[in-house]
Amino acid sequence: NLLQFENMIRNVAGRSGIWWYSDYGCYCGKGGHGRPQDASDRCCFVHDCCYGKVNGCNPKKAVYIYSLENGDIVCGGDDPCRKEVCECDKAAAICFRDNKDTYDNKYWNIPSENCQEESEPC
């Protein structure tokens, strides 16, 4: 669920997902359309695509099981849908961490007109 995703981002990327990514680029926070503005926004685009492939549960509400082992996130549990959501969140948290240096405040709260291009396929 979104609270677990927030905690995962904090654990992996060392920053708040709500503060840094809730309204960033064309894909972070709000649905999404257009071209990802940078690598951090692309993390959100890929995360949206990942959620779109999940079947059997609501990715934003599904409560999953994960642990932090030697700094790595390990998704667990027997429910394949919840585990898939966990893997989507894990990949995004790692992507945010790996692209912290590309984050640019100019993409925070950008006008929707900047996101009018046709979206690329997942």
Curated annotation (Swiss-Prot):
GO molecular function (one): calcium-dependent phospholipase A2 activity
GO biological processes: arachidonate secretion; lipid catabolic process; phospholipid metabolic process
UniProt cross-references to SUPFAM superfamilies, sorted A to Z: Phospholipase A2, PLA2
Active site: 47, 89
GO CC entries: extracellular region
Coiled coil location: none
Family: Belongs to the phospholipase A2 family. Group II subfamily. D49 sub-subfamily.
PANTHER family, per the entry: BASIC PHOSPHOLIPASE A2 PA-11-LIKE, PHOSPHOLIPASE A2 FAMILY MEMBER
Function: Snake venom phospholipase A2 (PLA2) that has high lipolytic activity. PLA2 catalyzes the calcium-dependent hydrolysis of the 2-acyl groups in 3-sn-phosphoglycerides.
Protein name: Acidic phospholipase A2 2
The organism of origin for this protein: Craspedocephalus gramineus
UniProt lineage: Eukaryota, Metazoa, Chordata, Craniata, Vertebrata
